[in-house]
């Protein structure tokens, strides 16, 4: 695979990483930071933050860009909501991000588990805000209603790539379905900030990127993240290019000009990386 440019190389404090990793092991929790081999793991762990990955670390889908294992998942752990709340309390988190491996094997896609976890966090950590990064729950409005009723401050569902590449890169997902879920959440509760993100480097064009921005803005999306695709292995979707930092600055300016309330656009930006900054920027909560 192509050698990474200098701006994608990261360094971090191993001791700080080990402390958070040990807490996660003790509470039998997964983080997307580790499961998805996130390049920001070191920085986030060093700041005692993490994105909790609910419902196990095995996914029922096999997106060609993703490093999470595909297979048959275990049943949900009934202790996980409380364990996540304990970890959030011990880390002193002001903003908690919850994500999951896609669980198409569950009737509600894991929505009830998300809701229980939100409630557990609110009970232990009053004042802590919560962001959910769910699957599309197969577009099921009843499942989405369960998450909406728990009222996360931010509802995130990543569109991942442009319409033209969607089926090749995410064969079990659907571009229109993702947009439909984002639209539905905003219609049901306009006070919830909606968020999505996509990657650069999969083979998209600038014109397609602009069209994607228009599509997600049209369904009321408030927050947008734009990041560099990093090919996990030779078996994954082939990297088309490394976009330069100046490209990401240009995409950010374009998105802000179109009307997004907050845009995080950088090579190492990820949907949950420094997620609290979007809330600070929109002045809704802080």
Predicted regions mapped to residue ranges:
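Auxiliary Fe-S-binding modules of radical SAM enzymes
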Residues: 1-51, 55, 82, 86, ...
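Short, glycine/serine-rich, charged loops/turns that create anion-binding
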Residues: 59, 102-105, 137, 203, ...
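Alpha-helical elements of the RecA-like P-loop NTPase motor core of helicases
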Residues: 64, 167, 207
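Core AdoMet radical
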Residues: 68-83, 90-141, 147-181, 195, ...
């Amino acid at each position: 695979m192509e050698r990474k440019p200098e701006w994608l190389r990261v360094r971090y404090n191993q001791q700080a990483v080990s402390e958070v990793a040990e807490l996660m092991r003790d509470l039998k929790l997964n983080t997307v930071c580790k499961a998805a081999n996130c390049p920001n793991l070191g920085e986030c762990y060093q700041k005692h933050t993490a994105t909790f990955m609910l419902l196990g670390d095995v996914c029922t889908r096999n997106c060609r860009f993703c490093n999470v294992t595909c297979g048959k998942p275990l049943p949900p752990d009934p202790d996980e909501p409380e364990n996540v709340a304990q970890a959030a309390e011990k880390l002193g988190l002001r903003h908690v991000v919850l994500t999951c491996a896609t669980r198409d094997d569950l009737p509600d896609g894991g929505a009830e588990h998300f809701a229980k976890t939100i409630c557990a966090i609110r009970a232990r950590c009053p004042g802590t805000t919560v962001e959910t990064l769910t699957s599309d729950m197969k577009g099921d409005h009843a499942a989405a209603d369960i998450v909406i009723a728990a009222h996360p401050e931010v509802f995130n569902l990543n569109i991942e790539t442009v319409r033209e590449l969607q089926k090749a890169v995410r064969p079990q997902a659907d571009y229109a379905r993702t947009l439909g879920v984002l639209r539905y959440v905003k219609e049901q509760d306009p006070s919830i900030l909606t968020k999505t993100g996509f990657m650069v480097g999969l083979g998209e064009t600038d014109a397609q990127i602009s069209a994607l921005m228009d599509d997600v803005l049209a369904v009321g999306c408030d927050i947008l993240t734009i990041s560099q695709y990093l090919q996990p292995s030779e078996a994954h979707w082939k990297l088309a290019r490394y976009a330069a930092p100046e490209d990401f600055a240009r995409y950010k300016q374009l998105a802000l000009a179109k009307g997004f309330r907050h845009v995080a656009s950088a090579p190492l930006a990820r949907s949950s990386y420094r997620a609290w900054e979007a809330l600070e920027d929109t002045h809704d909560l802080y």
